[in-house]
UniProtKB/Swiss-Prot annotation:
GO biological process: translation
Posttranslational mods: One or more lysine residues are methylated.
Gene symbol of the encoding locus: rplK
Pfam family, one: Ribosomal_L11
Protein name: Large ribosomal subunit protein uL11
InterPro entries xrefs: Ribosomal_uL11, Ribosomal_uL11_bac-typ, Ribosomal_uL11_C, Ribosomal_uL11_C_sf, Ribosomal_uL11_N, Ribosomal_uL11_N_sf
Record-level Gene Ontology MF annotations: large ribosomal subunit rRNA binding; structural constituent of ribosome
Length: 141
């Protein structure tokens, strides 16, 4: 018989940087999950993606065991990395802070495709372009 699911926890954690400090510790502690075990498994799985923010969905079962699924980094983080910026514009409709090419947008769309609800790469690219626009990043091409 399958284990009973008691909850889901959604977090965004730096790759290879999970530790028991907030926000990870309190979120897992509330559900009774072994915090150190999660940190070890997450850090081992995401070591190759150092420096990126990785969204993770943790499924907690009634016997306090857990499984987790990592997602692709948020489009905003990938756009900032491609445009070599620290942060987006505070006023994206007035101040443009950087530019990315259509080729870079397509590359991000290819990476994000499994997590986006789009049929093709063009649809995914449109979503990434919308994110860029809301951050004050101009898409050229």
């Amino acid at each position: 018989m399958a284990k009973k699911i008691t909850g889901f926890i959604k977090l965004q954690i730096p790759a290879g940087g999970a530790n028991p400090a907030p926000p990870v510790g309190p979120a897992l502690g509330q559900k009774g999950v072994n915090i150190m075990e999660f940190c070890k498994q997450f850090n081992a799985k995401t070591q190759s993606e150092a420096g990126m923010i990785i969204p993770v969905v943790i499924t907690v079962f009634s016997d306090k065991s857990f499984t987790f699924v990592t997602k692709t980094p948020p489009a905003a983080v990938l756009l900032l990395k491609e445009a070599k910026l620290q942060k987006g514009s505070g006023e994206p409709n007035r101040n443009k802070v950087g530019t990315v090419t259509m080729e870079q947008v397509r590359k991000i769309a290819e990476l994000k495709k499994p997590d986006l609800n789009s049929v093709d790469i063009e649809g995914a690219a449109q979503m990434v372009m919308g994110t860029a626009r809301s951050m004050g990043i101009v898409v050229e091409g």
